[in-house]
Each structure stands twice: as C-alpha cells, then as structure tokens.
Amino acid sequence: MAAPTLTADGPRLGQQEMKKMSPSFHPTLWGDFFLSYEAPTEAQEAQMREKAAVLKEEVRNMIKGSHDVPEIVDLIITLQRLNLDYHYEDEINEKLTVVYKSNYDGGNLDLVSRRFYLLRKCGYDVSSDVFLKFKDQLGNFVEADTRSLLSLYNAAFLRIHGETVLDEAISFTMRVLQDRLEHLESPLAEEVSSALDTPLFRRVGTLEMKDYIPIYEKDAKQNKSILEFAKLNFNLLQLRYSSELKECTTWWKELRVESNLSFVRDRIVEVYFWMSGGCYDPQYSHSRIILTKIVAFITILDDTLDSHATSCESMQLAEAIERWDESAVSLLPEYMKDFYMYLLKTFSSFENELGPDKSYRVFYLKEAVKELVREYTKEIKWRDEDYVPKTLKEHLKVSLISIGGTLVLCSAFVGMGDVVTKKIMKWVMSDAELVKSFGIFVRLSNDIVSTKREQREKHCVSTVQCYMKQHEITMDEACEQIKELTEDSWKFMIEQGLALKEYPIIVPRTVLEFARTVDYMYKEADKYTVSHTIKDMLTSLYVKPVLM
C-alpha cells in the first residue's frame, strides 16, 4: 500500500485546519502509585515461594494419581479456573489424551458437558452430537439439576457454525437458570450469576483466578492443598504484575503525557491490565510489557488523530511514521516531536532486548504500526468528506485494521520465547482468517459502546452508523443486531482456532485470550475510557493480596 502523502490524499485547502476541541477525558486514577508501591520483603517472598514449591508438587502428584475421567475432568477445569494449569502442561496434556480417548457418551449431562467443554477448549475436535441424547421426542432439552444445566450452558458457548444443538442449549439453559437463580444457595448461586453475566469460556483468566478462589473455598469438595497453592500463586503473580507495572509506569512518565499530550487518555495501568489479560502466565512478562507500551502508543495516535490534530497535522504524522526515521521529525508540529522520537527509541529498545536471534520480529511490529496509520488516514478522509461507507463490509475493509487487533497480536508474539517462529509472525500479518475474525470482533465490540460518545463531535462514521444507513434502522436496533454479529465472530474464532493445526496451541489460544479481554472491556461500557468502572477490580488484582 502506498504511503500517505500531503497532496492527493491530503485534505482540501482550509478544510479541518482549525485546531479541534479535544474531548475531556478524566485524569489518571493511578498516577505514581506503582512507583512507590511497597512489596513484601525478600525474606517474606522467599518464604512464600518455598511453601508454594511444596504445594506445587503435592498437586502434581494429584494429577498423576487421577485415573477416572470424571476425576480428571474436574481436576483440570479447577486448575484452569484457579490459573494453576500452566505449572503442569505436560501432565495435563497426558491426562487430556486419556479423556479424549475415553469416548464417554453416557447419560450424565454434567460430565458430558464438562468433558466437551474441556476438550474443545484445549483444541480437541469433539462432536456436539453427544448432547442430542438429552432431548425428548419433540426435540426439546429435558430439564435436569441446576449444576448439570450450568455445565451444559458453559459448554454450549464453545459452539461453531452449524451446531444448532448448542444454539438451542444456550436458549434453554439461560431461561431455566434465570428462573432458578433466586432460589439457589451459595456457592452455586454465585456460579450461576457469574455464568449468566459471562459464560466460563469467555472470562478473562486473571479475573477468573481472583473471583474463583472464594467460590472454591466454599466448595464442600475443595482440596486444601489446591486452595492454599492457588492463594499463594495469586499473591506471587501479584508481586510480578506490580513489578511490571512499576516498569511500565516509569516508561510512561518519561513521555510527560500530562504536560506534552494532555488531550490523550492517561491509562497506563488500565492498558497493562487489558494487555496482560491476553498473556497472563508468568513466562510472558516480556510480551506484557511490549504490549502495554504498544497500546499506549496506539492510544496516543488514536486520540491525536481522532480528536486533536488538524487533518494536515495528521497526514504529517502519518508520513513520518511511514518513513520511520529520526530525520522525519522535521515534518511534525512541536507537540508531536517528542512522541515520535520516543516511539522510535522504544522500538530500538525492543530490538536490543530481543537480541540478534529474535530482533527480526520488530520489523513485523513496525509494519503493523505503519499499516494501522495508513488505515487511520483513510478514516480521516471519510470524516473530512462526510463519507458513509455503503455497507458494513466496505467499512470493515478499513476499520478491522484501524482498531489495532493485528498490531496487538503481533506485539504479543514479538515478546514470546522460542515457540514463536518467523512463520507465525508472517501468519499474523497475512490476513489470516482467525486474525480477521478477531479484528472484526474488536471493531464491532468497540463501536457498540463508543459510537454515541464519539459522535458528539465531528468524527469518522462508525460501523453502527454505517449499519443503520445500510439497513434503514435506528441506532438501538443496529447495536442489537451488531451484538449478534459479535456472537458470529466468536463462532468463527473458535472454529478457525480448532482448524489451525499447523501452529502450536499458543497461537489460537492467544487470540481467544485477547477476545476475552475485549469482551470484558467493552461489555456494557467502554471501561478503558471511563476507567472509574474498573478501579476497584484493579485494586483487588494488583494491590490487595489474597488472605491465606
């Protein structure tokens, strides 16, 4: 694609050249908090790690000693929900083979549902026909105990296209669970309520870890070693996350956003949460830090081009990024120069940190940034010309890239270890179907909650407005129908992930993890822009340890 220029692709003379009134975003809720956050002493941390190591081996022996399918399924799902499974990948993979080969198709709805959920989530090709036996002669699902229906409900959200039985299972179980909810006791009541809000498969792993510990503690069948290890593991991860937040905050403060770029959203802690939700296991520390920095840059670009820069300034910035050279800073207005130089400096630091064997990955990252900005310039042209794409499909040709989904995935893989190859980096940048489905999901989820806010000023038309015009319906009707399209995107992502056999499981798993974070951040509101809504959650995740 040709680089954006200041001539043919630029704005008409005099158009949009008055400096815009930037929207008023609330200031940072965190400031320097993580720069002065006091972690436990080295002696305290060493004691925690020593105890955790003992418990880790106890749980390992439990996994090795599990033989019956029901026992294996329950144990692995519990470890996944408590975010302990990454400690036992080899042992769990061995047990998953046992579960898969069992071909269990008995009449226990709870077990059939949980087995299906576990295997499909872990990438196994299992048939949804196992649920047909739980229908009556009229084709309706037969009522069962609440625990079994909850398991069926959670399993059904791993549906792909053509699985009518799972579509029907969701409708049936949702209605019954809603009717029964007020009559349930703890902890089942909390489980059902949480599932109706967000099905188990769609929950952000770090949040599920935090939220499930107190539920598991109330479970009559809880194992004390697993519970204690889960609490220690949470607290140790919290120390790691807090340390990474200190590093990211230090990096962010160097940019002096509050004085140099006061019109952008100052959300470094929220960015870290959003991005770490996509790769939260401890071994992905480098990915989390790279992701946080990249999405902080995306935020600056988005807020600058959307709401502050003139069209001419926007094209100047786009050309400078296309050139990707310090000499291009001369193209820019003063307020953009520090940001541009810091962008280049940060990318150079990525190359140095990755070393000679992995620094090639940063090339793909640069190309993803350039591609993002090229699509931004197309949206600026739409805005300046008051152009509304005729169809949603036309809009998405531009906006599924400009939302940044490809760049996020590229950033995640750049920071991972030897599992990521040049083949994977090329795949991310190649318009792969799974990457496109993810981009569409992010775009539609974003636009549902941001359209009303953004249209208070002159702004590029959203997918919602495009859909309204295409189908001659109201905004509320368009949002409801687009929500159905996001459900379609979930189906696409799951089936495309299952089909991606030539790549390691971490590839489709990472895409789905980021889909979960997007679902959370855009559910009901834009929690990134209006981050008061998640302040308490972030405090419980990064500041308050779990009581032992």
Curated annotation (Swiss-Prot):
Binding site for Mg(2+) 3: N446, S450, E454
A biological process term (GO) from this entry: terpenoid biosynthetic process
Record EC number: 5.5.1.17, 4.2.3.113, 4.2.3.55, 4.2.3.15
Cofactor section: Mg(2+); Mn(2+)
Binding-site list for substrate: D302, D306, R443, N446
Gene Ontology, cellular component aspect: cytoplasm
Record bears the keyword Manganese: yes
InterPro entries in alphabetical order: Isoprenoid_synthase_dom_sf, Terpene_cyclase-like_1_C, Terpene_cyclase_plant_C1, Terpene_synth_N, Terpene_synth_N_sf, Terpene_synthase-like, Terpene_synthase_metal-bd, Terpenoid_cyclase/PrenylTrfase
DDXXD motif (motif): residue ranges: 302-306
Keyword annotations from UniProtKB, A to Z: Cytoplasm, Isomerase, Lyase, Magnesium, Manganese, Metal-binding, Plant defense
Annotated compartments: Cytoplasm
Top-level division of the source organism's lineage: Eukaryota
GO MF, one example: isomerase activity
Reaction catalysis annotation: (S)-beta-bisabolene = (S)-beta-macrocarpene; (2E,6E)-farnesyl diphosphate = (S)-beta-bisabolene + diphosphate; (2E)-geranyl diphosphate = (4S)-limonene + diphosphate; (2E)-geranyl diphosphate = beta-myrcene + diphosphate
Tissue expression profile of the protein: Expressed in roots. Not detected in leaves, unless damaged by herbivory or infected by fungi.
Annotated binding of Mg(2+) 2, by residue: D302, D306
pH dependence comment: Optimum pH is 7.0. Higher pH values favor the formation of (S)-beta-bisabolene.
Chief location category: cytoplasm
Cofactor note: Binds 3 Mg(2+) or Mn(2+) ions per subunit.
Free-text note on domains in this protein's UniProt record: The Asp-Asp-Xaa-Xaa-Asp/Glu (DDXXD/E) motif is important for the catalytic activity, presumably through binding to Mg(2+).
Something else known: In the presence of magnesium, the product spectrum is shifted toward an increased production of (S)-beta-bisabolene and a decreased production of (S)-beta-macrocarpene.
Subunit structure: Monomer.
Function: Involved in the biosynthesis of the bicyclic sesquiterpene (S)-beta-macrocarpene. Can use both geranyl diphosphate and farnesyl diphosphate as substrate, but not geranylgeranyl diphosphate. Produces mainly (S)-beta-macrocarpene, but also smaller amounts of beta-bisabolene and (E)-beta-farnesene when used with farnesyl diphosphate as substrate. In the presence of geranyl diphosphate, produces the acyclic monoterpenes beta-myrcene and linalool along with minor amounts of the cyclic compounds limonene, alpha-thujene, sabinene and alpha-terpinolene. May be involved in plant defense.
Family: Belongs to the terpene synthase family.
Protein name in the entry: (S)-beta-macrocarpene synthase
Organism per entry: Zea mays
Top-level taxonomy: Eukaryota, Viridiplantae, Streptophyta, Embryophyta, Tracheophyta
Name of the gene this protein is made from: TPS6
